[in-house]
Structure formats: structure tokens, C-alpha cells
């Protein structure tokens, strides 16, 4: 406790978390609960009424209802029905959101406290589609982010391994296509069995992951099997779910490449500017700190632009896209801890980002959700670079980091853009910003 009182980074985190908590305590009281947010709540409600997943539901994202059922049960126990259910679920989301902020900060702070503070703030103001409710987007992003933090920090204790397993189970329940993430980690573990490059991928740790997975997987299997008529019927239902006509029926690669092409086309001016700055820093080593600072400012500028002019086009999901490219630049420039940065800080969230194209009918807008963990880890990469490559000037008798100042300005602009969008945007209410004038 004394360490928390003495450390200015700890105090900065607490102040930021308090501000974000107060902001959302105000914000969750406003905005309509239409379309997705209200629909999410029908699944756990029906489960409590006796329906079974994969038998009585048709959509790809239904498995999230299994995670929401305890919350709906608590709602019914405390209030006897569904009165106030939307507001109460938003409160559940806020509690979980703050918990993820705190846990991620505590884990990252042991690597870089300044980076941990900045990453926690970026995560705190990032909400997929502005949907402040426990759903397959919000819980999926939280799971991927914590997985990235745990692996990036090389956490391999029993508790960390069990938590990794639970998070993998949550991730797959939020998005079944995230079995690709699980398969990717198993592939890495298999390669590690021959090369021995990562201790946290050793067999004993992988076995503990599966104990964590079983915590959710076994109750889920019991729930599904007690409601199905036969195994063949269950398999047929699963097949029909993946052929859901409400979602794009084209091939997996077609959906992914279409979204990628659209992303590149919509941001071609940003990408051109980024390429010039990045290549300049790559070719001339001594100006890399300056170029990285300018890249961070460029990312923040485009986030501010999207917040001002495209708030109802991308639902605020694009604000963290630009930091994905900033993260890649910091990773390449840094050269230290490249394996952890690339594999867990960047590749893991990017793989999740691609799976969102397959599970959602929102295309690029859904894909952009996956850039939230990338952005948070990217901020951490920036901090790691500053620590390893300080670029300072004399100011008032003290050495001041020029790159640090540039990154601080970029962070302030990034947080300002995200705060503005979170305060103004209401999901699916493109023409009715007055929805924020009425309480829930």
C-alpha cells in the first residue's frame, strides 16, 4: 500500500480510473437500448426460461448468452423480473471494465509503469460500437487484451495459466471463430516443444490452460447436451447456424480481404503519410525517435478527424486503428523484446481482429473493434521505446524527453477523441443525437 502512495504512476492510474468511472456512471444513464444491446439480453433470459443454446437459437453470437446467464439470474433474484435490466447490465459492464483496467495496469506496471498507465487509459475509453453492456464484442475485447498482457509479461504461475485458460474459453464463447486463436497458441506450443524459446509455452503450462478452459467448457457442454434431442440434430443445428442468411455467406478469405481492401482504401491518405515517416526513420537511424513521435501525432490527428467527421460512420471503432500502425512502427524500431511484442502484443490481437469479419455482418466496422487491444499494446510499445532510446534536451536545468513530450501530446489527443465519441455517440441512432437527453 505504501508503494502505491509513493509511486506517481500509481496515483496517475487511480486518478484516471476514477475520472473514467465517473464519466461512465453518468454516460450509462443515457442513450437508447435498441437493436443489439436489447437483443443480447434476450438470450440469457430465454436460457433461464428453459431454452438451450445450439438447439433453440440460430445466430453465431449466441454462446455469449451462457456468460450472461449468471448476471440475468442475479437481476431476477434482486429485482424479481426485467425492470431496469438494461441499466443494471450496463452497471455490470462498468464493474468488469474497471476490473480489466486495474488488472491490466497491475500486470503491465511491472514492465513499464508509464506505459501501463497510458495503456489502461486507452482501454478505459475504448468501447466497441459504444455498446456499454456485457456482449460478445466487449467481453471478447477484454479477453484478448488480458491474454495479450499475460503472455507479453511472460506470466507463467499457476494462477496466470488458469486465468489464460478461462480467458480462452470466454473468447471462444464470445466468438467461435476464435478457435483459430486457440489453435495458434497450440501451434506455438508445439513448435516450442522442439525449439524451447518460450518457457510459458511448456507442456505443464499448456495443461494448466486446459484446466482453466474446463471451468467454463464442462458446464457449457452439460447445458447443451441436456437440451438436445440427439448428437446428429445438434451437429445439423451448428451447420445451419454457420450458414445464417443474416451474415455474409461468401468465403472466409473473401470476407477478410474485402474488409482489408476497404480499410486500406478509406485510410489511404493516412497510410501514405505514415509510410513516408516510417521509411524515413527506418533508413536514418538517428532520426527514429523524432519519426516515431511524429507517427504518434499523426495517429492522434487522424483519430481526432474521425471523431469529428465520421462519428456515425464507424461508431468510433476507427479511433484505435491508427495506433495499430504506430504499434508496428514502434515494434520494428525498438528491436528489443521483439518476440513478445510481435507474437502476443500484435499478432494475437490482429488474429482476433480477422475473426470478427467472420462472426459479424458488420464487415470493416466489426473488424475495427479488434484494433482496441492492438492500440493498448501499441501504447506500451511506445513507452518501451522511450525507455530504451531517450531523446532529450536541456530545459530549465533538467533533461526533458522530446519524444516523451510528443507522445504525451499524442496520448492526450487520442484520449480526447475517444472521450468525445463516447460522450456523443449512441449506437444505431445516427440521426438522433438527442437520445442523450433522456435518461434510461
Regions found by a protein language model. Name each.
Residues 110-114, 144-163, 195-198, 331-339:
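Membrane-interface transmembrane helices that cradle and orient dolichyl/undecaprenyl
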Residues 205-282:
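Membrane-lumen/periplasm interface segments of specific transmembrane helices
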Residues 127-128, 148-150, 160-178, 182-188, ...:
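Membrane-interface alpha helices of multi-pass inner-membrane proteins
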Residues 150-171, 200-211, 289, 343-347:
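Short hydrophobic alpha-helices at membrane interfaces in multi-pass membrane enzymes
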